[in-house]
Regions:
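Glycine/small-residue-rich loop that forms an oxyanion/phosphate-binding "nest" at active or ligand-binding sites
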Residues: 59-102
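Hydrophobic core segments of alpha-helical transmembrane domains in multi-pass membrane transport
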Residues: 9-22, 41-50, 63-72, 113, ...
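Hydrophobic transmembrane alpha-helices of multi-pass solute/ion transporters
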Residues: 29, 44-58, 85-94, 238-240
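Cytoplasmic-side transmembrane-helix entry/capping segments in multi-pass membrane proteins
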Residues: 30-40, 61, 85, 156-165, ...
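Transmembrane-helix boundary and interhelical-loop signature of multi-pass inner-membrane proteins
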Residues: 19-33, 49-55, 147, 151-195, ...
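Helix-loop-helix junctions within the multi-pass membrane cores of secondary transporters/permeases
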Residues: 100-175
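Structural signature of hydrophobic alpha-helical transmembrane segments
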Residues: 1-15, 58, 62, 126-137, ...
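Juxtamembrane boundary at the C-terminal end of a transmembrane helix
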Residues: 225-240
Length: 240
């Protein structure tokens, strides 16, 4: 288990917000768009390389299918967007500029809620691998720099929220890690990496995958692994 990713991510948000305050006139859209696409390609590479850790592609396929179905039925992606809309409607700007609350809530929502934060924290807690959270840190740094040019210093405060959320998820993942077999960890890494690859594709503008709807797959992977390890299942499998 490693908290490095959560700490660096929090500091990156603070640094990004500070950079944004220095460039109140705004960062040229051409520059920010090009940088974000480049980071998206890096995210895509991390996702693809991590997917090769798979122990049982069949378990991952079943988990992704069940997870996608559950996520679509629950409309997780839609719920996240509705939450964002609700926040925008209830956090108002002061006269003459944005409030600290607006910058804090908006940046916290955008940086804390997402497959990359969840999967990165799980990876840091279970395998001690911070690569996803460190990549997310670079993305958040650039994103918060752009956000701070319009929402002000409140964006920097989101670093605390991100540390609490990602830190808690990392500690939780570290606590359950001893309960997971090596095969379960490998398949969980594979499923999570597929979600990270989807985020990378979205960030480049190539696709518009509702990645949040696939998050339940991360719960189905260890569940299916546990089921297939039961003696009853192994007896059934032996018949075939």
């Amino acid at each position: 288990m490693s908290m490095t990713g959560a700490i660096v991510n929090a500091l990156a948000i603070v640094a990004g917000g500070a950079v944004g305050l220095l460039f109140q006139r705004g960062i040229p859209e051409r520059v920010s768009k090009t940088v974000m696409i480049g980071l998206g390609l890096c995210v895509l590479y991390i996702g693809i390389s991590g997917a090769f850790a798979c122990q049982s592609i069949l378990i991952v396929i079943v988990a992704m299918t069940l997870g996608a179905a559950a996520g679509a039925l629950l409309n997780i992606d839609g719920a996240i967007h509705r939450l964002g809309t609700w926040v925008e409607a209830h956090v108002h700007r002061h006269e003459g500029g944005p409030s600290l609350a607006e910058g804090f809530v908006t940046a916290s929502l955008l940086c804390c809620v997402g497959a990359m934060a969840v999967n990165g924290s799980l990876d840091a807690g279970i395998r001690g691998d911070n690569s996803i959270l460190l990549t997310k840190s670079m993305i958040d740094l650039v994103f918060c720099a752009m956000l701070a040019t319009t929402l002000g210093a409140g964006v920097m405060l989101a670093g605390a929220a991100v540390f609490v959320v990602e830190g808690a998820l990392t500690l939780l993942a570290g606590a359950i890690a001893p309960l997971l077999s090596e095969a379960a960890v490998a398949d969980l890494t594979c499923a999570g990496s597929l979600l990270v690859a989807a985020i990378g594709l979205n960030q480049t503008g190539a696709t518009k995958i509702k990645v949040a709807d696939y998050l339940p797959a991360l719960l189905f992977v260890p569940l299916i692994r546990w089921l297939v390890s039961l003696p009853a299942w192994q007896q059934i499998a032996a018949w075939f």
